[in-house]
Amino acid sequence: STLANKIVDCIKNDSNPEGKFLHPVSKFNQHLCFTGGEPLMITGQQAVVGIYNELKRQDNLPGSMTFETNGTQKLKPEFIEWANSIDTEIFFSCSPKLFTVSGEKPEKAIKPEIVAEYAKVSSKGQLKFVVGEKDREWNEMEEAVAKFRDAGVDWPVWIMPTGAREEEQTAGAGKVAEKAFKRGYNVAARVHVYLFGNAIGT
């Protein structure tokens, strides 16, 4: 209940003094995103269920929930049972790390069988890859996409240009976007960087 109350406190402001997900001004039922770190570690899965149950007890549920994950964490049976029992939409945003970009070894980072489990829990999701202009990065990304497709994951693919700072993104983002569109992928920008800079808490 402490974590749920902290989340409610975070969305309190002058126009939403009680911290309601159903915003009193826009009348829009807002979204709750679990990010990290890695929110689908075993302790994270347990915490999410507790947070949801407490928000439900307070009659203050979000319109939908997203899990921002690297797609390597197996779902516990208890989490799957809970996810299948609730009416709130669950969305998985999976961002597998590429060796050519992050140095993460493929056998650790690319887990199609695990992401396929997520897709069975919810048809709502996406695969998101951080990619630059280099051909080897694109080749690795498309090899990974093929593995996810073979496992039955048919979520859309989003490409996020490399670069944590706005000037880094601006330098190559156009070329990355052009490549993505030609290959039938979507492009994701780091909007928070444009708005607030690469600062903690944004």
Which residues are covered by each model-predicted region?
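Active-site beta-strand/loop signature of hydrolases that rely on acidic residues for catalysis
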Residues: 36-37
